[in-house]
Amino acid sequence: ASVTFWTLDNVDRTLVFTGNPGSAAIETITVGPAENTTVEFPGSWVGNWYAYPTDAEDVPGMLGEVQFGGWNGLTYFDVSAIVNPTDHDNVKQMWPAESRKPMSGCEVFPCDNAYWLPDDIQTKVTHEVDLWTTLGAGSTGLTF
């Protein structure tokens, strides 16, 4: 299982990972626009991540959330604004690497394709175990 992080602007960011109880710890990393960065996860990892500019204060923002190896071996994922809906500059979109469908999140926030309230029905599901996540302002040029 993996997530590839694609920085769309010129900002270096720190990525902080929080695993659910029983999930392995994933090291905090720094990513930037020079190249995409792929993080490997254990096959049944459940948790989330957020990003913040490396030269800024560590403030949790928009979350990328995932459950690898969930019910029937599926991957469940979403972009969540519940913790900090004012973060419009860090975690933006998530999608399965091969099919690129379904996509969660927004190229420009706010939109109706992310979790805003705890009872929103926004969790996406895929048979794939490799995902992409965009960071920062800009467009992938992909059509979802």
Curated annotation (Swiss-Prot):
EC number: 3.1.11.-
Quaternary structure, from the entry: Homodimer.
Keywords: Allergen, Exonuclease, Glycoprotein, Hydrolase, Nuclease, Secreted
Cofactor (UniProt): Mg(2+)
Name of this protein: Antigenic protein SchS21
Site positions per UniProt: Critical for IgE-binding: R100, K101
Taxonomic placement: Eukaryota, Fungi, Dikarya, Ascomycota, Pezizomycotina
Annotated compartments: Secreted
Molecular-function annotations in GO: DNA exonuclease activity; identical protein binding; protein homodimerization activity
Residues carrying covalently attached carbohydrate according to the record: N36
pH dependence: Optimum pH is 9. No activity between pH 3-6.
Region (IgE-binding epitope): 91-105
Annotated effect of mutating E98A: Increased IgE-binding of the 91-V--P-102 and 94-M--G-105 peptides
Major place of residence: secreted
One GO CC annotation: extracellular region
Entry note: thermal dependence: Optimum temperature is 45 degrees Celsius. Activity is about 80% of the maximum activity at 35 and 50 degrees Celsius.
